[in-house]
Amino acid sequence: MSKPFMFEKPFGMRDTLPEWYKTKKNICDQMTEEINLWGYDMIETPTLEYYETVGVVSAILDQQLFKLLDQQGNTLVLRPDMTAPIARLVASSLKDRAYPLRLAYQSNVYRAQQNEGGKPAEFEQLGVELIGDGTASADGEVIALMIAALKRAGLSEFKVAIGHVGYVNALLMDVVGNEQRADRLRRFLYEKNYVGYREHVKSLNLSTIDKSRLMNLLSLRGGRAAIEEARGLIQTEKGKTALAEMTKLYEVLESYGASEYVKFDLTLVLHMSYYTGVVFEGYGNRLGVPLCSGGRYDELLSKFHRPAQATGFGVRIDLLVEALNGEIISNGHEQTCILFSNERRFEAIELARKKRANGEAVVLQDLAGVTDVDAMSSNYQDVIYCIGTAGRGGEDA
């Protein structure tokens, strides 16, 4: 490997420039305020976790984990997601708290990427976990909260696609009969490679009726009618139970007034292997990839010896900023620069103090430290000159 240039960053890492940071902070502040109004408590977990605990139970592939050794020889990982660390936290520091628990977070996560992938290896997530409630009310609450948080951030055009792990698994296993063959079909669905899915189904040694059932799965998208259509493809109790749960969930979302933002997608398969029930993805205007996702994971907590049903969601902040693209709420803090000479220093400082007391963002800049006044002035909305022995506000003495 060649020596990196001084300006290079590790692959997949990004710098955050001032404008982007302000926008991101404003969005996160708005969403956090909404989440707090729903009774969720913000928490933080360490950037580093033990590989043998969080690393092993995380649904992120092992080759995507950033690993390192501590001084005692223990293998550590940079946290690859937030759900597993929160499960560890609930089973340890919060073990004496009664369920249900409503927790929220805003944290960076880390996943190693291939050089040609073009994906970030570090990105910020904001999300919630509702732990200890297995009802449709809990599923509906987190989806309704996600919708409310996106709206609070300023996103006006988006849809949330809702599926169910139990339905997909029940149908595939009922038709193809073994986990290996079902997993191959699930992979096509996860990649949204519907052409590959169709071609693979055609190649299977199945009856015409069973092939038709697998093909018709791809059409199960839309409103409540999609649920009714899905009933005709399923014969197992697990599949019927999944549809009953989705019907109840829709009723809960209607009571929140959130049904206009959702649609059913029975083909939906997410990459997190610990999901056990309802799953969902949110798509923003003009954005071709999901900017948020979540679902029910009723078995993860048992790996930390404190079994509990749970559901939650996470929002990719970088993708949300991209989806907003002009709908971003202004934070109202445009900067003014006071450019002063030495003899007007005290006057400039007093003026800056008054403006800051009124909530204005003010930069104090000594004229002696500037080589190009015109170039510097272009960085600010307004420039006040305190230069010379008399006059200000653009009047030089």
From Swiss-Prot:
GO biological process, one term: histidyl-tRNA aminoacylation
GO cellular component: cytoplasm
Compartment list: Cytoplasm
KW Transcription regulation (keyword) present: no
Stored InterPro entries: aa-tRNA-synth_II, aa-tRNA-synth_II/BPL/LPL, HisRS-like_core, HisRS/HisZ, HisZ, HisZ-C
UniProt keywords, alphabetically: Amino-acid biosynthesis, Cytoplasm, Histidine biosynthesis
UniProt keyword annotation of Transport present: no
Domain of life of the organism encoding this protein: Bacteria
Miscellaneous comment text of the record: This function is generally fulfilled by the C-terminal part of HisG, which is missing in some bacteria such as this one.
Similarity comment: family membership: Belongs to the class-II aminoacyl-tRNA synthetase family. HisZ subfamily.
This protein's name: ATP phosphoribosyltransferase regulatory subunit
Name of the gene encoding the protein in the UniProt record: hisZ
